[in-house]
A protein has these predicted regions:
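Catalytic-core regions built around general acid/base machinery
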Residues: 10-18
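EAL-family c-di-GMP phosphodiesterase catalytic domain
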Residues: 1-6, 18-125
Length: 125
């Protein structure tokens, strides 16, 4: 993103113009940057599993998750917590302000056909 800011911004705007939501993945690690929240038209931020995996026992990870949720709320962005594996993690991220969660607590990665069957099963429940 940093090397091609103008091209990236134009591409993201085109995607959004076609009704495609854009997420900033793995936020809080690697090359993700606070600057991206202001510079690019994201709809959602995905909190990296590295923080979620330490919840709820690691106070530092908890503080980071809460801070990301608060920051995203200020920018009107929805938040997804990645890597939820336990119910205490689910409860923590929900209380912190995460709108969505993903991880093995809900389901393992699966091919499209299996996902469609899973989705039908969830709708019927």
């Amino acid at each position: 993103l940093l090397d091609h800011t103008d091209a990236t911004l134009a591409a993201l705007k085109r995607l959004r113009a076609h009704g495609i939501s854009v997420a900033l993945d793995d936020f809080g690690t690697g090359y993700s940057s606070l600057r991206y929240l202001r510079a690019f038209p994201f709809d959602r931020v995905k909190i990296d599993a590295a923080f979620v995996g330490e919840l709820p026992s690691d106070e530092g990870a908890g503080a980071i998750v809460r801070a990301i949720c608060n920051l995203c709320q200020a920018f009107s962005l929805s938040v997804t917590a990645e890597g939820i594996e336990t119910d205490p993690q689910r409860v923590f991220v929900k209380e912190a302000g995460c709108s969505f969660g993903q991880g093995y607590l809900f389901a393992a990665p699966m091919p499209l056909e299996s996902f469609m069957a899973y989705l039908d099963q969830m709708r019927a429940a």
